[in-house]
């Protein structure tokens, strides 16, 4: 992998620009990576700031997310992943101080914090074997709403992912 990758994703709804996401991913000396994303969604007046550390297999080690909506901080949470536990600690406008502990039966493969570039990490868990076959990827997310602006707590998730095939050039 390159040492540093950056880019921008434009959000569109019905042909109109509704926001953007700027992201950076850089390799660390230990073989892991750090992913940062700043998401601005004008249609719902939401800004999401995400930073996530990944191990050598792109599994989450820790992550931080802050949401600002309509000029007001909705919440900030820190997710810390241990071999058999996920800890979520934060301060939320709707819930005050929160502290959650979730027992993990296996290492956590996926933590969905809603930047599109982070959502793409689910494809690494799914892999490229058996085109056309759907695999269910278990993980956690911080919100089950499409915009990622509700809840902001650690919630179990299961994502159905199908590898269609390799891109043709």
Q: Language-model segments: what does each one mean?
A:
Residues 43-95:
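Hydrophobic/aromatic-rich structural module bridging two neighboring secondary-structure elements via a short loop
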Residues 35-37, 74, 143:
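Non-transmembrane, interaction-prone segments in cytosolic or luminal domains
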Residues 8-13, 35-42, 64-68, 88-90, ...:
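Short beta-strand segments that buttress and anchor functional surface loops
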Residues 1-20, 30, 79-167:
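Solvent-exposed helix/loop surface patches that form functional interfaces
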Residues 23-24, 50, 77, 159:
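Residue-level detector of beta-strand structural context in well-folded domains
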């Amino acid at each position: 992998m390159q040492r540093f990758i950056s880019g921008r994703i434009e959000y569109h709804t019905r042909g109109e620009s509704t926001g953007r996401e700027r992201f950076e991913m850089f390799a660390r000396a230990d073989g892991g990576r750090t992913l940062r994303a700043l998401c601005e969604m004008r249609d719902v007046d939401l800004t999401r700031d995400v930073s996530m550390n990944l191990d050598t297999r792109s599994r989450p080690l820790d992550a931080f997310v802050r949401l600002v909506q309509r000029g007001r901080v909705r919440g900030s949470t820190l997710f810390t992943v241990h071999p058999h536990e996920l800890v979520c600690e934060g301060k939320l406008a709707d819930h005050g101080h929160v502290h959650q502990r979730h027992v993990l039966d296996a290492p956590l493969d996926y933590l969905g914090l809603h930047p599109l570039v982070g959502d793409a990490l689910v494809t690494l868990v799914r892999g490229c074997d058996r085109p056309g076959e759907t695999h269910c990827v278990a993980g956690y997310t911080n919100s089950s709403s499409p915009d990622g602006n509700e809840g902001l707590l650690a919630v179990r998730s299961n994502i159905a992912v199908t590898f269609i095939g390799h891109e043709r050039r």
